[in-house]
Amino acid sequence: GVIINVKCKISRQCLEPCKKAGMRFGKCMNGKCHCTPK
């Protein structure tokens, strides 16, 4: 995945930031969002 500079606690918090970054969805790992490219 692609790490974006968005802090998170749960994976659901990464959904919008990843969409805004032009990617599909993301999960929270080590306090940062990891997005899945389209």
From Swiss-Prot:
<keyword id="KW-0964">Secreted</keyword>
<dbReference type="GO" id="GO:0005576">
    <property type="term" value="C:extracellular region"/>
</dbReference>
<comment type="function">
    <text>Blocks voltage-gated potassium channels Kv1.1/KCNA1 (IC(50)=0.6 nM), Kv1.2/KCNA2 (IC(50)=5.4 nM), Kv1.3/KCNA3 (IC(50)=0.014 nM) potently, and moderately block intermediate conductance calcium-activated potassium channels KCa3.1/KCNN4 (IC(50)=225 nM). Also shows activity on muscle-type nicotinic acetylcholine receptor (nAChR), since it reversibly and dose-dependently inhibits acetylcholine-induced current through mouse muscle-type nAChR heterologously expressed in Xenopus oocytes (IC(50)=1.6 uM).</text>
</comment>
<dbReference type="Pfam" id="PF00451">
    <property type="entry name" value="Toxin_2"/>
</dbReference>
<dbReference type="InterPro" id="IPR001947">
    <property type="entry name" value="Scorpion_toxinS_K_inh"/>
</dbReference>
<comment type="similarity">
    <text>Belongs to the short scorpion toxin superfamily. Potassium channel inhibitor family. Alpha-KTx 03 subfamily.</text>
</comment>
<protein>
    <recommendedName>
        <fullName>Potassium channel toxin alpha-KTx 3.7</fullName>
    </recommendedName>
</protein>
<dbReference type="InterPro" id="IPR036574">
    <property type="entry name" value="Scorpion_toxin-like_sf"/>
</dbReference>
<keyword id="KW-1221">Calcium-activated potassium channel impairing toxin</keyword>
<feature type="disulfide bond">
    <location>
        <begin position="8"/>
        <end position="28"/>
    </location>
</feature>
<keyword id="KW-0872">Ion channel impairing toxin</keyword>
<keyword id="KW-1015">Disulfide bond</keyword>
<dbReference type="GO" id="GO:0008200">
    <property type="term" value="F:ion channel inhibitor activity"/>
</dbReference>
<feature type="disulfide bond">
    <location>
        <begin position="18"/>
        <end position="35"/>
    </location>
</feature>
<keyword id="KW-0528">Neurotoxin</keyword>
<dbReference type="GO" id="GO:0090729">
    <property type="term" value="F:toxin activity"/>
</dbReference>
<keyword id="KW-0632">Potassium channel impairing toxin</keyword>
<feature type="disulfide bond">
    <location>
        <begin position="14"/>
        <end position="33"/>
    </location>
</feature>
<dbReference type="GO" id="GO:0015459">
    <property type="term" value="F:potassium channel regulator activity"/>
</dbReference>
<keyword id="KW-0800">Toxin</keyword>
<keyword id="KW-1220">Voltage-gated potassium channel impairing toxin</keyword>
